[in-house]
A protein has these predicted regions:
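Short, basic/aromatic recognition patches
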Residues: 1-22
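Sterically constrained small-residue positions within well-ordered secondary structures
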Residues: 15, 31, 42, 74-76, ...
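Short helix-to-loop capping/linker segments positioned immediately adjacent to catalytic or ligand/cofactor-binding
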Residues: 11, 23-27, 106-112
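Charged, gly/pro-rich active-site loop segments
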Residues: 1-7, 77-130
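Short beta-strand segments
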Residues: 19-55, 69-72, 83
Length: 130
């Protein structure tokens, strides 16, 4: 079922706060999908998915090489969501700190990583049911 990212139902927003891992799909330069497990956070006000990662990761390289879209998919039994949108990589210390803060609230405090960046996906399509 397609959902409006700007007006998600309460059960969907609740599902996005539960402690689950997800998959992140980016596109390799040859057009094939690269799928990895990630922790992520959802910013309902900004319509953003945030994924913290090392600056030298393949997912970052794919986005910097022009991966036009990214998808984060979270599944828990019969509940599932796919959040699709346009990815960007930010090295801005304030944006990275905000992503780390949100990650720590949902999962745990991540280890220090001076090379950390944040992958931000502006979500324009949500599919699923929670």
């Amino acid at each position: 079922m397609a959902l409006d990212p700007a007006d998600l139902p309460d059960d969907v927003r609740g599902f996005l706060t539960e402690r689950h891992l997800a998959t992140l799909t980016t596109m390799r330069p040859d057009g094939t999908p690269h799928v990895v497990a990630v922790g992520f956070t959802w910013d309902d006000e900004a319509g953003l998915v945030r994924v913290i990662t090392g600056g030298a990761s393949r997912k970052v390289a794919h986005v910097l090489a022009g991966s036009p879209r990214a998808v984060v998919a979270q599944v828990d039994r019969a509940r599932w969501l796919s959040l699709e949108g346009v990815p960007v990589v930010s090295r801005d210390p304030e944006r990275v700190a905000e992503a780390v803060r949100r990650y720590a609230l949902r999962y745990r405090q991540p280890a220090d990583n001076p090379q950390r960046v944040v992958l931000e996906i502006t979500v324009d399509r949500v599919l699923g049911r929670a």
